[in-house]
A protein has these predicted regions:
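Beta-rich nucleic-acid/ligand-interaction surfaces
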Residues: 92, 167, 206-210, 280
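Aromatic-enriched alpha-helical interface/lid elements that frame and gate functional surfaces
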Residues: 122-194, 198
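Flexible, small-/acidic-enriched active-site or ligand-binding loops
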Residues: 223-273
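A glycine-rich dinucleotide-binding beta-alpha-beta segment and adjacent secondary-structure elements
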Residues: 193-243
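Active-site-adjacent "lid/gating" segments in soluble enzymes
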Residues: 1-134, 138
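Amphipathic terminal alpha-helices
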Residues: 209, 267-281
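Alpha-helical scaffold segments in soluble metabolic enzymes
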Residues: 63, 67-71, 146-150, 174, ...
């Protein structure tokens, strides 16, 4: 009531209400509880761990940013702020887009490797002869034709149209055997000149050296508190204004300044440091 224009956002695992509101959790738990993990994996192994924190980042952080920005726009129209209760498990549940819609309407849950986009078709990763991987996402007819012609598998074009799992398993096996005949570098070179939705699985450092990301300015340098330059991944937001990239400070770097702003005296601050209550860097 004292600050009606205030926008206050909290991000927690399960939100401020509901039976799980006081329970601890991590990204893996939110993916499990939301249903995302129930179809993200292999029939042979079950659910797989994602290398990035989907619920934390794509779920919690991104939903929080969108909610705050939407609230800023609403406040400009109404003059009122609001409290935003962002739950990472809610946000993960909301990421069940196409599979969620079909499951609720058809009352049939997706399974591991049974759907178009989770391995049911030949949309998948394939190992090369030197134990690296290609991603093949040739779903549309033009890309399917381009892929199979390049692999010398035109005879399978008719079978592609038949989306029964047995048929698709056979096609995946044939493609897998074909990809295993050449090295990662050989396939990368060949498919770089072919528009078939096939890309190599790169390491982070390989991706950072890729001409596309370099030209798109996806790398930047930040200055740390000692004046050293640190290479970092840039934001994907295409702002045209010049950005000043500064690396974060070490834990405790501003402890004294913060406490002084709260009217703590030098002796009080020194006592807190000596007793280990706070850290100074």
């Amino acid at each position: 009531d004292k600050h009606p224009k205030l926008i206050y956002c909290s991000i927690t695992g399960y939100g401020q209400t509901g039976p799980l509101k006081n329970k601890a959790g991590h990204d893996i738990n939110y993916l499990a509880l939301s249903g995302l993990a129930s179809y993200s994996g292999r029939q042979e192994t079950g659910p797989v761990l994602s290398g990035t924190q989907i619920a934390d980042i794509a779920g919690g952080s991104h939903h929080a940013v969108m909610a705050v920005l939407a609230s800023v726009i609403e406040r400009a129209n109404t003059g009122k702020g609001q409290y935003l209760d962002i739950s990472m498990s809610d946000a993960a549940f909301a990421l069940n887009t196409m599979f969620g819609a079909s499951a609720l309407v058809g009352e049939k849950d997706p399974g591991y490797g049974t759907e178009m986009l989770n391995g049911g078709l030949f949309y998948d990763y394939y190992k090369t002869s030197d134990d690296r991987y290609l991603s093949i996402g040739s779903l549309e007819p033009a890309f399917v034709i381009s892929l199979l012609k390049h692999l010398g598998l035109e005879s399978y074009l008719v079978k592609i149209a038949n989306q029964k799992l047995d048929n698709q398993s056979q096609i995946k096996k044939v493609i897998s055997d074909k990809i295993a005949e050449k090295t990662f570098d050989q396939w990368t070179k060949e498919f770089s000149e072919l528009d078939a939705c096939v890309e190599p699985v790169l390491s982070i450092n390989e991706a950072a050296a890729h001409p596309h990301f370099i030209q798109r300015n996806m790398l930047c340098e930040a200055i740390d508190q000692n004046g050293h330059k640190i290479k970092q991944i840039n934001t994907a937001l295409p702002f045209k204004s010049t950005q000043n990239h500064t690396a974060g400070c070490q834990l405790g770097h501003h402890s004294r300044e913060v406490l002084e702003s709260l009217s703590y005296g030098d002796q009080e601050i020194d006592h807190l440091i000596q007793t280990g209550c706070i850290k100074i860097s």
